[in-house]
UniProtKB/Swiss-Prot annotation:
Pumilio repeats: 200-239, 336-371, 372-412, 509-547
Family according to the record: Belongs to the NOP9 family.
Gene3D superfamilies named in the record: Leucine-rich Repeat Variant
UniProt keyword annotation of Amino-acid biosynthesis present: no
Keywords: Nucleus, Repeat, Ribosome biogenesis, rRNA processing
Region Disordered: start-end pairs: 1-53, 631-700
Name of the protein this chain belongs to: Nucleolar protein 9
The species this protein was found in: Pyrenophora teres f. teres (strain 0-1)
Amino acid sequence: MPKEHKKRGRREDQKKRKRDHDDESASKRSRKEDVDHVQAENPLQHVANHVPRQDAAPFYGMLDEQEQEYFKKADEMLELNQFESPEDRRIFLASVCKEAEGKELKMATSQTSRLLERLILLASEDQLKSLFQTFSGHFLNLVQNRFASHCCETLFIKAASAVSQENASIKTEALNTPPASDPDEIIVSMENLFLYTLGELEGNIGFLMTEKYASHVLRVLLVILSGEPLEKQAKSVTQSKKKEKVTVSGAGDERILEKRVVPQSFLEALEKVISDSVSGIEPHYLRSLAIHPLGGPTLQLLLKLELSHFGKSRAKDEKSIIHRLLPDNPIAEGTESAILINGLVYDSVGSHLLETIIEHAPGKLFKQIYGEFFKERMGSLARNEIAGYVVGRILERLGKDDLEEAMRQIVDQIPSLVERNRTAPIKTLIERCVAREVDCSPIKAQLETAYAGPHGFEVTRILKLNEDDGKPRARHGESNEKVHGSLLAQTMMTVDGPLGQLVFDSLANLSPELSIQLARDGTASRTLQAALVSRNATVIFRRKMIQQFYGKIGELALDPKASHVVDAIWYGTVGLAFIRERIAEELAENENSLRESQVGRKVWKNWQMDLYKRRRNDWVAQARTTAGNEVFQSFPDESQSDAAAPARNHRTSRHMSAIELARQKFAAAKAAQAKDGKKPKKGSNRTNGSSETPKSLVAQ
């Protein structure tokens, strides 16, 4: 009897379906429990729940497959920018813009938003206004969308400059791409379009401050309203570090905004946003917002704009952000304000808010906070990885007497700071001591001991170089340590005295192999570049340092990192014309390899090697003029102005070598002979290669 036909593996399928069902149920339970747990722990959820907003974002439709493929190819072509002529590019852009008409919302909420960003960067003022009107009524949903939020951010930044131009009555020239025309369209100013957008977001600011995507757009909008420049650092408070940078050839760097004059309506709107953002939040929820990963940076920006644009007297206003954060007067231990400050010091997010308070707070409030919480703790706080940056902000506001006291505390911790590779407080301390004219000798003594090696102070220990394997050490977190070490060494060299001389002497005593390694290291080479162009570097140091690279200039000029050192040698050969010619000869010997390399071509251009090859005499004359007259001046006489002498000899007045001292003594004897009436014979030459004092120097 034939058996019933059954599918093979049915038992496994049943088991798999059962496992999947159990996993899904467990996952749902787990997610629900996680949400409940977060809601219980995060008091900010209470604030968000009281903000009226739509439960589900509207659906704007999807592009069909042909449209998606077309826009994808258009995006690739704009990115590559391989058009045969500008006219072809203009025609292509016109066709893309025409195809995108009426589909802007679909594009903004899908992966084709990258193409829309590029089109915004290339858009004219009329096209920007048209897109503003298309997005009008949808901004609250768009700023919360993963893709559309980037389009809104780009649109705001691009349109911000147009506001200033409109107010200055400057008519901008339209781009080649014609805008979409509608006979029923009502043209409004860019200023009003921004204000309409704010009107859409009004009442939702508290929620948007902590929204994953909208919080970044909100910060950009606040900066635009204030007229402040838009920061573009990696850790800028206005932008996520994960944001992809979308660019397009021909648009320039339109994402950078300089400081601008904004209309009064913008400042009034900004003041209202600052007031509304915290008006409905209880004080304990506001303090929780200070340590929120998304709300914290927004609160920092609001506080900074409040104190910098509307006067530090607002600290007395009970409705201001600073007063609501720190309501107690005086701020004493045990108060709510004291609890907040002590909690922010060691928090990775909250410490940034505390830095903002310290930087922008009124003088009376700062002195109160410093005296109560930090004056006796500067040394211990400097050792902490997070609190060390707060210490740096405090040092920037201290007077000379308080700075000397803080220096004594921090100097005792320098060995511990060096051991932990936390050199940022030391760098800031040196900078402030120089600015306040505080003696740096205690810092020099501690650093000399902390970075001591078999041959005394070793700059390679600051720069984290390993002489044995010829490569930088590979270990976790070394990148930041190397950057901070390089910055510390560069700061030390700005000090005219024993502290800076530690670095110069150590660099001059490096072996040729280690000097080459230093030049090839991307981070450490910046210290070498700074040393070669430093005003405190003596002629002897620069000569000894540059001679370490003889025979290797061609190789270094081809290295992406070391090529910058070769460029710095041009400025480092001031007063060393013969060394400059020696380096140029070595570059000329490697002409073929340099011309074949993009890096090498830049070095060739910076050293003016085409002039060297074609008209060598002109190059030599120019090199000797720029490299010789800066330091090796003609001997002074009575015809030269006494006031001009220090300016002409600013290098020789510092760390004078034996030969320079001898020249100075000879010049003094020469001046004494002139006073006695003894003149040199006519035609005699007592100067370095010139028969008379240059007229330009006398004129000075």
